[in-house]
Regions:
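Short, ordered loop/turn segments at secondary-structure junctions
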Residues: 1, 30-31, 55-56, 81-87, ...
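Glycine-rich oxoanion-binding loops at beta->alpha junctions
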Residues: 1-50, 57-59, 85, 96-103, ...
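Flexible loop/turn segments at secondary-structure boundaries
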Residues: 1-2, 34, 59-60, 88, ...
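Accessory alpha-helical/coil subdomains and C-terminal extensions
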Residues: 41, 52-54, 60-75, 79, ...
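Short, high-confidence coil segments that cap the C-terminus of an alpha-helix
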Residues: 47, 177-178, 268
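Short beta-strand elements at the ligand-binding edges of bilobed clamshell
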Residues: 90-102, 243-246
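C-terminal non-catalytic interaction/assembly regions of soluble proteins
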Residues: 197-324
Length: 324
């Protein structure tokens, strides 16, 4: 947003090796920007095609810009390109960056497992990105069979009582003497006090599920005289700032090509995406209706539960229900 409003143009014709590095040479921004000011700047600069690269918030911004362009009857194409590690863009099965983030997340999980196994009743706790969608946590769990509990925003859980996380963790320690827990950052928010404050983009500020788990695990185990050692790993931005995997590089290249083809063919107000191995054009209004979330009745989530062996913890929806 800021680079368009200023405007600040960047010559990229000589940047032939940018695909080898993480990050972005274009920069990024957070917070609402005025669609009117952006379109004013596009007009002044004689820009006829705008590519908006990003996640759910960026696609909503693209929709606002597209509507402002249409209201002025301007000939400016607005094309969205999905890029978010959270994989939470509606109708986009997999966004660019997701595979890379999952790959890096597995390294953190492997470290947590190593630490947990290195001491009696060792517990490795890993917090991964995923404010409202638990795709990274679920996919990384499936990739690493060492995970014993996975917690995601879409599946509430209880701490104590029958089927609670803490009794299940106690049983795990009694039988195997170590455990690994993976939690998406948005998991367990129903157990935390939240102020209701928001960030610059209007997202609710989350409580820290890792702090909750660390304190509650210590309280529960100490009360029962169970010696334990908990090691906490938060890879945070590491999983999104690394160079892309080979598959993500290829995927990104195709997304860029199809986005340019769409714009040159006169398309606008759309997002380019890949569905069932076909690159398609999706209306911006469609992909911004809601945020894509992990379906807890899906094969993916059921496989994650089977991989961990945790089953449905108390508070999660019953497994026997069907998704209508």
């Amino acid at each position: 947003g800021y680079g368009v409003q200023s405007p600040a143009f960047c010559r990229v014709c000589g940047e032939r090796d940018i695909h080898r590095f993480g990050g972005t040479i274009l920069g990024s921004s957070r917070g609402p920007q005025s669609a009117e000011e952006i379109v004013d700047s596009l007009e002044r600069s004689n820009v006829s095609i705008l590519f908006v690269i990003g996640g759910d918030g960026s696609m909503k911004a693209a929709l606002s810009i597209s509507r402002e362009v249409q209201a002025r009857n301007l000939k400016i194409a607005v094309i969205g390109i999905p890029k978010t590690i959270d994989n939470d863009i509606n109708f986009i099965p997999q966004s660019f960056g997701f595979e890379t983030a999952v790959y890096k997340a597995t390294e953190a999980i492997e470290c947590a497992h190593t630490e947990a196994r290195g001491m009696p009743n060792g517990i490795g706790l890993v917090k991964l990105m995923g404010r409202e969608s638990g795709f990274i946590a679920a996919q990384a769990t499936l990739a690493m069979k060492e995970v014993n509990f996975v917690l995601v925003p879409e599946a509430p859980f209880t701490l104590e009582g029958e089927g609670g996380l803490l009794p299940a963790l106690e049983e795990r320690l009694k039988s195997r003497h170590h455990a690994v827990i993976v939690a998406a950052e948005g998991a367990g928010q129903h157990l935390l006090d939240r102020s209701g404050a928001t960030d610059a983009s209007g997202n609710l500020l989350l409580g820290d599920v890792a702090d909750l788990l660390r304190s509650e695990i210590k309280r529960y185990m100490d009360a029962r005289g169970i010696p334990h050692a908990l090691k906490y790993i938060d890879p945070s931005y590491i999983i999104r700032s690394v160079p892309a995997t080979a598959n993500d590089k290829v995927y990104c290249g195709f997304l860029g090509q199809y986005a340019v083809h769409a714009a040159m063919a006169g398309r606008t107000d759309m997002v380019v995406g890949k569905i069932q191995d076909r690159y398609v054009h999706l209306p911006l209004e469609l992909v911004t209706r809601r945020r894509r979330k992990l379906n807890i009745y899906s094969d993916l989530w059921r496989a994650a539960l089977e991989s961990t062996g945790q089953g449905m913890l108390a508070g999660m929806l019953p497994q026997q229900e069907t998704h209508g």
